[in-house]
Every structure is written in C-alpha cells, then in structure tokens.
C-alpha cells in the first residue's frame, strides 16, 4: 500500500478546538432554548463549523447532547488529597464551582425534562454523563473504605445518591444556594453517615 493511499485511509486528525467549540455551543443553546429547540444548524453557526463537521462526530442530536453534557464532567477534577475528608470536600466544592455557573445551571432543567420524554436521550445521558461521573465518585469512596474511614460494607449506590442529591435538589427544585457551605455539609454527611465503626469512635 502506498503512503498516499494510507494517509487517505487514516484521514485528518480531529481538531480539538472544533470539538470544544461544538460542545460549548451546544451547551449554551440548550441553556437558552432547551433541548427541543436545539438545531444542528444553529450549533454549526455558533461554533463556526460546517454541519458536516458535527455529523462526522455525532450521528444524531441525542449523541451530541449526551456528549455536551458529559463534557461537564471533565470540568470537575477527582481529587486525591491524602485524606477522605479532604477528597470529599474538594470533590463537592469542584461540583459547586461547575453547577453554579450560568450555562451549567441552565442546562440541567431542560435536560431532565427532555430525558423524561425521550428514552433514547435518557439512555445516552445515563451511559455517558452519569455512569462516567458515578464511576469517578465511586473511586473516591473506595479510597475512603480502604483507608478505614468509611464502612467496609458501604452501599455505594446510596452513598453516590447522597453525594449528588442535595446539589441537584437545590438546582432543580428549591433554588437554594449552591455554595461551599452545601459542599462541606454533604461531605460531612457522608463522613458521619457512612463512617466505619472505628472512625465514628475517633470522631467523638
């Protein structure tokens, strides 16, 4: 095979700037208009790319939306401070920094509504955004178990729900403040509610 034909098969490398522009444009349009009004034409215009550039990356609007929402996860670092308390506080403070942003806060209500109406979209978001995020959070909890700070029979699914629940309840339902006080309170709730027996005795 010639080097020319080989290079054609390989194709041009993806442009990371275009990737980011497409996802940012998608998030901003969702926040402004909702998912039902999201159009690929508008994403292309806002991102300054052609529609073909988008369709080479995402086969459908659902795939694009799921990828855009999943990109929010990459903005929340998974800390390793050396202590379970430090990890949980930094983890929740990172989530607070992301979800009190105007774009991120604007995306979630429309996303939840769209997921309730569109099983295909719901599945795409759960398999991308939620599964990836929960796996990263579970790694932090697992370190807490291994350090002896969290109980050895920890119910990971329940603990993960407790980590995310208060933030999204305020974001979607009550409109309460999403701040470091909330972040620290959730971390403390995990540390006390799921503490190993020895850790509970040491904290008294």
Where are these regions (language model features)?
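C-terminal peripheral helix-coil segments that are non-catalytic and often amphipathic
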Residues: 1-8, 90, 131, 135, ...
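Basic, helix-initiating cap at the start of DNA-binding domains
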Residues: 1-46, 63
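Short amphipathic alpha-helical segment with a characteristic S/N-K-E followed by hydrophobic residues
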Residues: 22, 37, 60-65, 75-76, ...
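Short hydrophobic/aromatic patch on the recognition helix
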Residues: 48-58
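Tryptophan-centric aromatic hotspots in well-structured domains and transmembrane helices
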Residues: 57-58, 125, 129, 168-169
């Amino acid at each position: 095979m010639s080097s020319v034909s080989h290079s054609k098969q390989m194709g041009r490398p993806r442009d990371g700037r275009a990737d980011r522009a497409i996802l940012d444009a998608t998030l901003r349009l969702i926040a402004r208009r909702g998912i039902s009004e999201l159009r690929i034409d508008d994403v292309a215009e806002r991102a300054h790319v052609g529609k073909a550039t988008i369709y080479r990356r995402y086969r459908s609007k659902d795939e694009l939306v799921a990828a855009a929402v999943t990109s929010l996860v990459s903005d929340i670092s998974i800390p390793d401070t050396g202590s379970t308390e430090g990890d949980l506080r930094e983890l929740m403070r990172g989530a607070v920094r992301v979800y009190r942003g105007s774009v991120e806060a604007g995306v979630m209500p429309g996303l939840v509504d769209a997921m309730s109406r569109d099983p295909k979209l719901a599945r795409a978001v759960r398999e991308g955004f939620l599964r990836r995020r929960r796996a990263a959070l579970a790694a932090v909890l697992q370190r807490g178990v291994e350090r002896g700070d969290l109980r050895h029979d920890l119910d990971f699914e329940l603990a993960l729900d407790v980590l995310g629940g208060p933030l999204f309840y305020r974001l979607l339902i009550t409109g309460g403040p999403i701040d470091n006080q909330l972040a620290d309170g959730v971390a403390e709730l995990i540390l006390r509610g799921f503490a190993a027996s020895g850790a509970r005795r040491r904290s008294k």
